[in-house]
């Protein structure tokens, strides 16, 4: 199920919240229809603004719309003219007072929706789909909060006669783990061969108890020792397989003589050195 379902809906109420927050008794269907119309209006009129998310809150006589965008200057416009136009269109649509909040996205490379929009824009500009996917993966993996990413393109890739799907993945993307923080984005690229769908999954770590899990860093000494001894190698054993120096009677005898010889010149507290003496005639 985790491979097919939308990650946001799969984790709704567990690690993710609702993007539309309001209560309605008899006007539920009308409010849902208005929310869909608001999101469609913002997505069709502001393609170049890089809108990552739209959150809607309602009260009795007011609608609050939060727009998370990577390019707030395009949404605001010169002297706020574009923001005033958007607010007027929303008030005409909802017939209520609209409070418009424009929020800037700090890391666009770690937002799945913006990554999907970037790949789709490159596909529309006749860039090879494999190159666009790899470039998006490389730029996303440079972000410190990204632990894994998967990018998938579906359609007539490269102008082929038969449509297919291809994806690239780097790092971990646990889609079935409910505590995993998975960001999901979807966008369509309009090309001369038809539409190509782009899906992006970004894994940003686990959420335990409402807080992001902090990965423990290994000590420097242990990491250094691990680098010095390559993996898969064992210390060489003397003698035949299954035998050591003291594994036989002769070996035990030799080992006992060597240990006795080493203990002659050493005491518990000091080391005694024996100098050669010359006999006098």
UniProtKB/Swiss-Prot annotation:
Q: What residue spans carry the Low complexity bias annotation?
A: 238-252
Q: Which residues form a coiled coil?
A: none
Q: What are the UniProt keywords, alphabetically?
A: Ribonucleoprotein, Ribosomal protein, RNA-binding, rRNA-binding
Q: Which domain of life is it from?
A: Bacteria
Q: Do the record's keywords include rRNA-binding?
A: yes
What's a single GO CC term here?
cytosolic small ribosomal subunit
**Where is the region Disordered?**
218-281
Question: Pfam families in the record, alphabetically?
Answer: KH_2, Ribosomal_S3_C
Gene Ontology biological-process entries = translation
Q: Which ranges carry the KH type-2 domain?
A: 38-106
**What GO MF terms are annotated?**
mRNA binding; rRNA binding; structural constituent of ribosome
Purpose:
Binds the lower part of the 30S subunit head. Binds mRNA in the 70S ribosome, positioning it for translation.
Subunit structure and binding partners: Part of the 30S ribosomal subunit. Forms a tight complex with proteins S10 and S14.
For this chain, the family text in UniProt reads: Belongs to the universal ribosomal protein uS3 family.
Q: What is this protein called?
A: Small ribosomal subunit protein uS3
Species the sequence originates in: Mycobacterium leprae (strain TN)
Q: Which gene encodes it?
A: rpsC
């Amino acid at each position: 199920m985790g491979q097919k379902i939308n990650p946001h809906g799969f984790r709704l109420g567990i690690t993710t919240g609702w993007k539309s927050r309001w209560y309605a008794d008899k006007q539920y269907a009308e409010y849902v229809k208005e929310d869909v119309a608001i999101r469609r209006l913002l997505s069709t009129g502001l393609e170049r603004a890089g809108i990552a998310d739209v959150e809607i809150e309602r009260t009795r006589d007011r609608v609050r719309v939060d727009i998370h965008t990577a390019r707030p200057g395009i949404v605001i416009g010169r002297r706020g003219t574009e923001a005033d136009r958007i607010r007027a269109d929303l008030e005409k649509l909802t017939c209520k007072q609209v409070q418009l909040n424009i929020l800037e996205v700090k890391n666009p490379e770690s937002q799945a929706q913006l990554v999907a929009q970037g790949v789709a824009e490159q596909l529309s500009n006749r860039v090879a789909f494999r190159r666009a996917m790899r470039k998006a993966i490389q730029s996303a993996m440079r972000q410190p909060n990204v632990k894994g990413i998967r990018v998938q393109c579906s359609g007539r890739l490269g102008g082929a006669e038969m449509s297919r799907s291809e994806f690239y993945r780097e790092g971990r993307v646990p889609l079935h783990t409910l505590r995993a923080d998975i960001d999901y984005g979807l966008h369509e690229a309009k090309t001369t061969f038809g539409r190509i769908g782009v899906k992006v999954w970004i894994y940003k770590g686990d959420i335990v108890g409402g807080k992001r899990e902090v990965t423990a860093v290994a000590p420097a000494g242990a990491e250094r020792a691990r680098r010095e001894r390559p993996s898969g190698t064992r210390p060489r054993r003397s003698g035949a397989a299954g035998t050591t120096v003291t594994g036989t009677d002769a070996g035990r005898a030799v080992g006992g003589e060597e240990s006795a010889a080493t203990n002659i010149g050493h005491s518990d507290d000091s080391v005694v050195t024996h100098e050669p003496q010359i006999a006098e005639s």
